[in-house]
Amino acid sequence: MHELSYATSILNSILEVLKEQESLGKKVTGVSEINLEIGDLTLISFEQLKFAFEVIAENTLCKNAVLNTEMIKPKISCLNCGFLGILEVTDELEAKCPKCGSMNVRIKGGKEFNIKNAIIEFDD
């Protein structure tokens, strides 16, 4: 379950930002939302990621944070017929041109894993 390591990475990154904010004299009361960008080729189960995050964030300022995700589709270019488009990720993990069926393709993107932003709550 590599989702646990991803969840841990998210939590550690956000807690580091909270620590920085507090070092600037701001009183952080919590995090309400964390927005992620996840590539389809990471094969991360978003439901498992959310569950793992909820468990490890339980006793932190992130305990009430809602995880949102934007899934990033990989792009494919066929070196055989010239097709350019989106690669639909399947369980087979085969990269074939949807137009001509060739496996002579290049794939760009789809492996992203980014924290896009987070909504941090402060005490006034």
Curated annotation (Swiss-Prot):
Residues annotated as binding Zn(2+): C78, C81, C97, C100
Superkingdom field: Archaea
Disulphide bond pairs: none
PANTHER family membership: HYDROGENASE MATURATION FACTOR HYPA
Residue numbers binding Ni(2+): H2
Molecular functions per Gene Ontology: nickel cation binding; zinc ion binding
Upper classification of the organism: Archaea, Methanobacteriati, Methanobacteriota, Methanomada group, Methanococci
Family note: Belongs to the HypA/HybF family.
Keyword set, alphabetical order: Metal-binding, Nickel, Zinc
Annotated GO biological process: protein maturation; protein modification process
Listed name of the protein: Hydrogenase maturation factor HypA
NCBIfam families in alphabetical order: hypA (TIGR00100)
Function: Involved in the maturation of [NiFe] hydrogenases. Required for nickel insertion into the metal center of the hydrogenase.
